Amino acid sequence: MAPDRGRRRADRRVLTDRDRKTRDRPRRNYARWRALSLSLVYVVFALHILHWKITGKTLAPLELNEVMYTLELGVITAGFLFMCFLVFGTLFFGRFFCSWACHIMVLQDLCAWLLRRVGIRAKPIRSRLLLWVPPLTAFYMFVWPQIIRAWRNKGFPTFQMWTDAEGWASFVTDNFWRNLPTPWIIVLTFLVCGFAMVYLLGSRTFCVYVCPYGAVFSLADRLSPGRIRVDRDKCQQCGTCTEVCTTAVRVHEDVKRYGMVVNPACLKDLDCVSHCPQQALRYRFGWPALFKSDKGGGRFGLPYDFSIAEEALMSVVFLTVLLSFRGLYSRVPFLLSLALGVIVGVFCVTAARLMTRSEVSLSTLHLKRAGRLTLPGGAFRVFFAVLTAFVAHSAFVRYHEYTGLRQ
């Protein structure tokens, strides 16, 4: 027995020494590097505009929605090539673009950081049906036109490159704002998608419930060999990785079950890697996840926040708002109308709860307590009434625009 006890003590000593070396090894602060990378996105934007102002011509803005024009008309644009580059990069490395170079992510993370600075941690909502908005939007943008083309027996268009004479499709342009919304609409889009959604619905809800490009990247990510992987000998299942994940990925459950993060919602911001107390997580290459995440307990691994009836109400309101605001006065862009649809849908469910429940909250605001309406609750009711009237007016305008165009 004595030799066995001595061997066990020696094993404990070896493990303790290894753990001490792991603990004392300096950690990489990926958050600072990511903040720098995201900040450079807007620096590049400013330099792009400055180059146009100085020279009179510049590279056309890289708009990912130009993929639709390429698929429909065969016109190769800068935005199409950029999207191809991102998809192929995601196929190999994973979803790094979303958290390291997306201009909307800059605003979302900035808002979340500012809220934390004042002690506010907005709780992300968990919805079944809203999860379908990004993939269905991507299907509508990129796949549905091809189905219509096949139905009408039209062949795929010949690839071609246009000059600036057409006014919207050239690689180089003398009109930087040719396809972009007006500055006021851009500011409104940034405020709604980058700030309002974070405060009201939680961190990175635009990525989860709106972004169609994220749906494409998540599909490509399933095939990527580059993933967050775990050293099972070091992992103690403490849950720190899940706690620090701002995309609400259940990291500790994935790595326990699969040895890697298989959820395609993982944006590779590497917060879990830098915060792991045992340094058990690493970004490495290996077998792709494929569709392993579909075998788990849903996107969040937690109960959803809305009943089936509430989800149905939210879906109807979402579609109504989307159709009412998209293209309103030839100004409101598609992504902004999607975001507004999600927000107003949640507002509508909240308003319904005010009539049926004794305790109601929205983000950090307590709207109703012990059956009594609070001051924020009263303000919400007034705001919701005004918002409902505005949506109804917008729907009226869009209906007459649509019927007028058909005549």
What are these regions (language model features)?
Residues 255-267:
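Short linker/helix segments within small regulatory modules
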